[in-house]
């Protein structure tokens, strides 16, 4: 061990070859430890709603407005502060409007630049100069650094800053400078972003959200059930491919696949129009508002039915191939009496709402027709060979996982599978039993195998496991006894649609259970929390996102308009800054145009979950622990230099 430690110190001495350099680094790191911790922003359940997501990202769930309030307090009217905040969110668009209304743009530029500089100073104050420098736009890096850095040696600071601002306006770079300052404020306001699941689902722009996240300065992702579904589809898993297309068709968003990812759906469309030519497909109507022509709508509905039937067949094959999944009860096609148009479920007969199944052979209901097989082969190749989709999924794999422990918070989407008594449920995965953290880790390992395993069998298991995670009752990302897709389409009886939730959801107020979950993931003591995405909080019914005395924070971003009628709000986001935890409840997002024109913001109400007595500093964070280890190693190196065990390289 001593030899290993000495070799490590020798390697460290190559980076810090002198006492002076090692000492300077210790001083620098110690200074960083004393800075306030950076602001963390938690978003979840974005569901493809790009506009609302982009707005929340720009305003930091109210963090930008709080900075404006902190800087200007009562010296500026609420209306002016909101106008300044809107400018920071949408600098280009806001300036286009101002130019139409303002008579003296030079004065407006001057006032606005001074205000933005003050906000930028406040926002940058919690970071090292080095970190701020890395965030500066190249074109204006030097000038911005001059403007936001205090210069004690200047006797006439006002004159110095005035000259810089006047020059910016004189050379007609004010607009570009305002944009640069606004984007810098946005970036510095949030130090790190957590996406607690479900970038994908029913909304029209998940691919745009992924592009945005790939440009974000610091982000991690906890996969949601819909994210896993898309990952499985990208890996070529047929059950996942069929589900992805069905959900896009159901919400009138097939253009995500066709335009966003360039996946050719023409063979499916041709097949659907041929096989269901005279079928109104009434059970497969589109959800949400769409702007289709009658002809386009008819085609989407027929495609919706065609891919749904293919899905039920393909899933039947997966279930038969994987008896260990214990999902035989979800194979329903062989229970249909095709002559009578009924189905037998749990000994009870139900009449089907749709009785037209031209592609199902009653003797072999799970066998794809030659045309269906050809369609699935083409789709499988299309998903596997789509460069943009593969790039997005690699990003999810690189930045994501099923859970994350970060600064004493446990982040995950969905639930921890529990028994009725609150103990952790034992789940069998390919012959071995797992529970709690081990279950998460083995499932995540299979997801990665589905993309990267060299052995064909392991790769196939990994792909099938992504489909399992999407809809199995023992999956942490699903947590219900069944996914009643077939019943919702074909049966009128609501009792057949019921999906019973895992006991986890009814035990979130049980402190013993919550503490056992936190302990399972290595967390104990004060100021520890579970941040849980996936479940909409029905605020209009008096439901609270704060559970178990503040130990559990159930946040669903509520970006999906479909849930907003149920919940009464547009969901919650969470901010964790140096002063504590703040939950923000959002009003529904009207539009980007309304946000710019009216200055309307979607954050409506903030709830302080926990206010810390002493301001949290970097030394209190995970980064702080790593920096302390680095300081300790450097102090060992200094000791080795001073004792003569290692010689300085001067």
Regions found by a protein language model. Give the residues of each.
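Feature recognizes metal-dependent phosphohydrolase scaffolds
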Residues: 1-650
